[in-house]
Swiss-Prot record:
Composition-biased stretches (Polar residues): 846-857, 884-901, 917-927
Quaternary structure annotation from Swiss-Prot or TrEMBL: Interacts with Atg8a and Rab14.
Top-rank taxon: Eukaryota
UniProt cross-references to PANTHER family, sorted A to Z: KINESIN-LIKE PROTEIN KIF16B, STAR-RELATED LIPID TRANSFER PROTEIN 9
Protein's name according to its UniProt entry: Kinesin-like protein Klp98A
Keyword Magnesium included in the entry's annotation: no
Domain Kinesin motor: 3-364
Record's GO cellular component terms: cytoplasm; early endosome; kinesin complex; microtubule
GO BP term, pick one: asymmetric protein localization involved in cell fate determination
SUPFAM superfamilies: P-loop containing nucleoside triphosphate hydrolases (SSF52540), PX domain (SSF64268), SMAD/FHA domain (SSF49879)
Subcellular location field: Early endosome
Length: 1265
């Protein structure tokens, strides 16, 4: 049993930390390490210790090179590396791995630099240094090296070819443990070879630059040395196998600190996953060790006291890294962990986490054992048993029978031990010879393949027959003779075949230069050129000897030099063309031109020449061959010129067609943009007409209520007056006055004012005057009421006529929209046909074109086409959202223009408005849940019921105080008692039209867009109309109302003029369309809120009861998102939902606050008391400016009910927005946005108040707030 050794090492500040003016927070003394808390952390944790102390096996202070306690690479190796080498020679497995955040110095500690090597090179160097000493004493060694990386949880062999990807699979053997399938093992015999393996693997390892480290390791690397040693000790064989795992881990990282995006972010996620799994394994092993050192594989283990204790699950297989290091963590290995630390205060949390993991790792207990060969172990056991039998035989000399049995057993064991020893010796000798042969030949294993690394120049046979083997001929220093077996002098390379002479040629190797010397009359071809004099050959040359023996010449030294010189080029084009031409000439070897062709086995008469070659001294033949070669070269040059010309022609044609396609696509896109902009303008105009129509309907509703009130008042006056007349006449009749005058009132005679005036003439002067004044006064009041009723009826008729005109205009706009959609559909069909034609053209050009640039241009065209299709799809997409309420503005609701002006209102008025908004929020929640079932199939006008005739020009009248038209014929409807039916018809038309318009409004989402110049003017028009409506209800005087109407008409004229100018400017169309969409979205919510309030005040008692029951019925806990009150703000602040927390008396609601900031998003949960503390704190800090902001009051009863929570959610959201607006204008505030201010960021919010600081466990709705 052996505990895991832990060492910590502190690196110096890097350039990033120096630029940040980081402070030193690390201290070391002997084995004790102290981590100081940063200043802010110390202030926050006042009353606690301002440091953390840890004790490890080794502590290395490498912060300052001038410090006398500075720990060098040599010191780290002397403490840790020597132990690893000792373990290897003792037969134990060993593992060293570095752990820490990114940029903390892990790779420097493990690998080092060429001038200052780290642990891995030093361990390898010491391993082979001791190996050389041991070989002198007769010890045999066998060493293999492998190097792998774990990148994105996939394994790659770093010593294999570069084309090998990250596709190796991890397996687990029953007894040998985890291993990587097809991982290449490379036999190494000295330090230079293993250093070359390390350098080759590091060159292929994945690294990248981040904000925290310029050369950040993006993968975990494991360098494994398999070390086998065998020796005879005391006439006893000994063989041990040790595995040394040297691990360089990638560092843990935070995305906001490293600035990782895209692929770097994905790599960091996989790195953190494997490191988290490593930490989980360390924690589980430490906890298991602390619980009794149980390592049984069963679920329950028995303790010494007899009680059963559960064994923890160790998640080795949750990550590739921990799976491969299974034996190193709690298994058969002696392990050393190096914790790399950053001394800067900016990395305090990561450093503390690393120290805690290292402190836990101290408790891990490994179970290392000597890895002895099974045969050697059996031999040793037999030797022990033989010694035991000899001792038994020596002590049993008096008994004959037992001695014979023991003696027989002894002889049997000795014979078995001798056979095993001989087999092991023979096996080891064979293995050593194989290693020597592999080293001499340069053979090494790479996965399932074998690689031949020969250092000497050599020839490789290229056969046309069915031979499956590879023939390699090494060239010796000096002369290498090549010929046939018939030669008088033994040839170094003996060949057979047509054209091979007894002494064919010689190859001279001197000083790395190889020269081919052909013998007279011998056919020697180099790269398809016949040579008859010595020629120097180079790497890759193709050599033909005779007519059938083809070889490729390889010179490793020259190849290495070429790779170094041509490192920037992946392919030597000149060499490729040479080899290609050689292959074309050599292909003629397989073409037999036997004229009769009678027998397939007949030797061909011609191979390379039209006829069998004569003597090379024949000048006519040489001239003929030279002419043929010149002709072929000229033909090749002409073909090459024609190929280049055709290539240029195709390239020019493709470029012209591409430009034409781009131009046509641009024209098509411009046309579609114009159609879309025109459609957006028509939709905006339609929405404005809908808004005006709804305003007129609301005004009609108000006028109807006023007419009803006046009618009721008139009836009351008439009834009182009739009662007064009857009472007076009854008194006169009772007094006998009527009898004196000779007047007699019969029972059926109506008692009117004329009768009373006749009677009053006979009375005294005072009584007559009193009765006349009373009659005149009552008649005057009745006349005024009749005039008011007539005036309201004229207003009602004018509004009805205006609504009818708006409906006609809307029908025209709808028809124009349909025409625009048809035009756009035709354009899309044309564009689809154009794209199909373009694709066909690409296919044709792709078959003819031979250059890479043409493919690149076509890929660009395809990408542009895809972009165009995406844009088109965006413009034609529609939503199925349907809303019920019609857009209306009332005095109980604020418009977007009035948000900033509401800061000084008193709390009572704000509470009254928010009480009204409770029902509107419920209405918006119901609308959001799904389409309304009460929406009609079309728009139903008032005239549709037959109760309101159309208005004629002769019966219209215009009021100067309201500017609306009334139909006098509607008075008959009111007098006949059909006022309620008239209201119902108006309400039905309102709901149906609202539902239709909501389909258009629902197309656009609530996304912040830049505002065009029409935005502020449109909002002014809306505000002016709302002001006029408010004044109509408050009975403002006529002069002021005329001024408001004149202002509204002026704004409308300016809006129409600006809209016409905007249509002429193509550059502003897109921004205007976006603004219209955003404005409609905002107006839709505002009108929806007000309309629900207005309809609730007009409904009958039955409908009021139903709406009240719906508002206060049990509903979802999550409320609807609130309206955007500040569309022009940069920071979007919402309280979209609330959740219930606690139980019993501790039950409360917490509100989710979402703030979108320039440097990220902030989501926090806060209860009402925290909001109140924030308000009181801001009032205390900034005085009257904050006191003027309305804040929701405390509720004494039902404070934890859902309606109260819904009501407060809206008020708290408004309060936070107004608070940010006010505080951003105060120079002393941390979120001041003026000169010198930091503005609204996460840091400034935390500095403003602890309300915006997230807690340690506050990660979502399930955290604490």
């Amino acid at each position: 049993m052996s505990s895991l050794k832990v060492a910590v090492r502190v690196r110096p500040f890097n350039s990033r930390e120096i630029d940040m003016d980081a402070q030193l927070i690390m201290e070391m003394e002997n084995k004790k390490t102290r981590l100081l808390k940063p200043r802010l952390q110390s202030i926050r944790d006042a009353g606690r210790d301002n440091h953390h102390d840890f004790t490890f096996d080794y502590s290395y202070w490498s912060f300052d090179a001038e410090d006398p306690h500075f720990a060098t690479q040599e010191q780290v190796y002397s403490d840790l590396g020597n132990d690893v080498v000792d373990c290897a020679y003792e037969g134990y497995n060993a593992c060293v791995f570095a752990y820490g955040q990114t940029g903390s110095g892990k790779t420097f500690t493990m690998m080092g630099t060429p001038n200052n090597p780290g642990l891995i090179p030093r361990i390898c160097e010491e391993l082979f240094a001791r190996m050389r000493v041991g070989q002198e004493s007769g010890t045999g060694y066998r060493t293999h090296a492998s190097y792998l990386e774990i990148y994105n949880e996939r394994v790659k062999d770093l010593l294999a070819a570069q084309s090998t990807g990250h596709g190796l699979r991890v397996r687990e053997h029953r007894s040998l443990g985890p291993y990587v399938e097809n991982l290449s093992q490379h036999a190494v015999s000295d330090f230079d070879e293993i250093q070359e393996c390390i350098a080759r693997g590091n060159a292929q390892r994945t690294t990248a630059s981040t904000n925290m480290n310029d050369t950040s390791s993006r993968s975990h690397a494991i360098f494994t040395i398999t070390f086998v040693q065998a020796v005879f000790m005391n006439d006893m064989p000994s063989e041990t196998v040790s595995k040394i795992h040297l691990v360089d881990l990638a560092g843990s990282e935070r995305a906001n600190a490293t600035g990782a995006t895209g692929q770097r972010l994905k790599e960091g996620a996989h790195i953190n996953k494997s490191l988290v799994t490593l930490g989980s394994v360390i924690s589980a092993l430490a906890e298991q060790t602390g619980g009794g050192h149980n390592s049984s594989s069963s679920a329950l283990a028995t303790t010494p006291n007899g009680a059963s204790k559960r064994v923890l699950y160790i998640p080795y297989r949750d990550s590739i890294l921990t799976w491969l290091l299974k034996d190193s963590l709690g298994g058969n290995s002696k392990t050393i962990m190096i914790a790399a630390l950053s001394p800067a205060d900016c990395n305090y949390s990561e450093t503390l986490s690393t120290l805690r993991y290292a402190n836990r790792a101290k408790n891990i207990i490994n179970k290392p054992t000597v890895n002895e060969d099974t045969n050697v172990k059996l031999i040793r056991e037999l030797r022990e048993e033989i010694n035991k039998l000899k001792s038994m035989l020596a002590g049993d000399i008096h008994s004959l029978q037992p001695s014979l049995k023991v003696l027989a057993d002894l002889q049997k064991k000795e014979a078995q031990e001798k056979v095993l020893t001989e087999e092991w010796t023979e096996k080891w000798k064979v293995a050593q010879s194989i290693l020597q042969e592999q080293k001499s030949l340069g053979l090494r294993k790479s996965g399932v393949g074998v690689v031949l690394d020969s250092e000497m120049p050599h020839l490789i046979g290229i056969h046309n027959d069915v031979t499956t083997g590879v023939t390699l001929y090494s060239l010796k220093e000096g002369e290498t003779r090549i010929g046939s077996e018939d030669a008088d002098v033994a040839q170094d390379i003996e060949l057979a075949g047509d054209g091979i002479r007894a002494q064919h040629c010689s190859i001279f190797l001197k000083g790395g230069v190889v020269t081919l010397h052909p013998w007279p009359l011998a056919q020697c071809w180099v790269n398809a050129h016949l040579i008859d004099e010595p020629k120097q050959i180079s790497q890759g040359d193709i050599i033909l000897l005779g007519r059938t023996n083809i070889f490729r010449f390889n010179n490793p030294a020259e190849a290495a030099k070429l790779r170094k010189d041509l490192s920037r080029s992946q392919l030597d084009m000149s060499r490729l063309s040479l080899i290609t031409s050689s292959k074309e000439n050599l292909l003629t070897c397989s073409i037999y031109s036997d004229e009769d062709g009678a027998s397939p086995y007949k030797r061909p008469e011609r191979q390379y020449y039209p006829q069998r070659p004569m003597s090379r001294d024949d000048p006519e033949l040489q001239d003929e061959n030279r002419k043929i070669l010149d002709t072929i070269e000229n033909a090749l040059k002409q073909l090459n010129v024609e190929r280049v010309q055709m290539h240029d022609q195709y390239k020019t044609k493709v470029r012209k067609l591409t430009e034409e396609l781009i131009r046509l696509e641009q024209e098509e896109m411009d046309g579609l943009q114009l159609l879309n902009c025109r459609e957006q303008e028509l939709i905006a105009r339609k929405d404005m007409l809908l808004w005006e129509k709804n305003n007129e309907k609301v005004q009609i509703d108000i006028v109807c209520r006023q007419i009803s009130a006046f009618q009721t008042q008139l009836d009351s006056k008439k009834r009182d007056f009739s009662e007064y007349v009857a009472k007076e006449l009854q008194e006169l009749q009772d007094c006998g006055k009527l009898d004196e005058m000779g007047m007699k009132i019969e029972e059926g005679t109506p008692l009117n004012d004329e009768l009373l005036l006749q009677v009053s003439d006979s009375l005294d002067l005072f009584a007559a005057q009193f009765i006349k004044d009373t009659v005149r006064r009552n008649n005057e009041e009745i006349r005024k009421l009749d005039e008011q009723i007539a005036e309201k009826e004229r207003i009602l008729n004018a509004s009805t006529t205006k609504i009818a005109k708006v409906d006609e205009t809307m029908l025209e706009i709808q028809a124009q929209l349909e025409r625009l959609r048809l035009e756009r559909a035709e354009s899309e069909a044309e564009s689809q046909a154009m794209r199909a034609k373009k694709q066909n053209m690409k296919l044709q050009l792709g078959n003819k074109s031979m250059s890479t640039s043409t493919s690149t241009n076509e890929a660009d065209d395809v990408s542009k086409s895809d972009t165009y299709e995406t844009c088109d799809t965006f413009h034609t997409a529609q939503s199925n959202l349907s809303l019920v309420s019609s857009p209306t503005i009332t005095e109980g609701q604020q418009s977007p223009l009035s948000n900033c002006s509401c800061d000084a209102e008193d709390e009572a008025e704000d509470t009254r408005k928010d009480d009204l908004s409770g029902s509107s929020e419920e209405t918006s929640r119901t609308c959001t849940a799904g389409p309304s079932s009460g929406s009609g199939s079309g728009s139903v006008g008032i005239g549709g019921s037959g109760s309101a005739p159309s208005c004629t020009p002769s019966s219209q009248a215009i009021m100067s105080d309201s500017g609306v038209c009334l139909d006098s014929r509607n008075q008959a409807i009111l007098q006949n008692g059909h006022l309620n039916n008239y209201k119902q018809a108006v309400r039905t038309s309102d709901e149906d039209t609202g539902s239709c318009s909501s389909c258009e409004l629902g197309r656009h989402s609530d996304v912040a867009r830049p505002y065009c110049p029409l935005h502020s003017l449109r909002r002014k028009i809306a505000a002016q109309k709302a002001l006029i409506m408010k004044n109509l209800e408050t009975d403002l005087n006529k002069a002021q109302l005329d001024e408001h109407i004149a202002d509204l008409q002026d704004l409308q004229r300016r809006y129409i003029q600006m809209e016409q100018e905007m249509l002429q400017s193509v550059q502003d169309l897109e921004a205007h369309a976006q603004c219209c969409a955003d404005e409609r979205s905002g107006m839709e919510r505002q009108y929806e809120l007000a309309s629900s309030i207005m309809r609730s005040s007009v409904m009958s008692p039955t409908s009021m009861e139903e709406s009240t029951s719906q508002i206060y019925s049990p509903s979802m806990t999550r409320s609807c998102p609130s309206m955007r009150e500040f569309p022009e703000g940069e920071h979007f602040i919402t309280i979209p939902s609330f959740v219930m927390r606690g139980a019993g008396k501790q039950t409360h609601y917490e509100y989710e606050v979402r703030i979108a900031l320039p440097d990220g998003k902030l989501n926090i949960l806060r209860r009402y008391s925290r909001f109140r503390e924030l308000h009181l704190c801001m009032k205390h800090c900034y005085g009257a400016k904050i006191s003027a902001l309305p804040f929701p009051r405390r509720e004494l009863f039902a404070s934890n009910s859902e309606p109260v929570a819904k009501h407060r959610r809206r008020l708290l959201e408004l309060y936070l927005r107004r608070l940010f607006v006010v505080c951003s204008k105060i120079p002393q505030c941390p979120i001041y946005e003026g000169p010198g201010g930091t503005g609204l960021t996460r840091a400034s919010l935390v500095q403003l108040s602890s309300f915006f600081k997230k807690g340690l466990f506050e990660n979502g709705k399930h955290g604490t707030g």
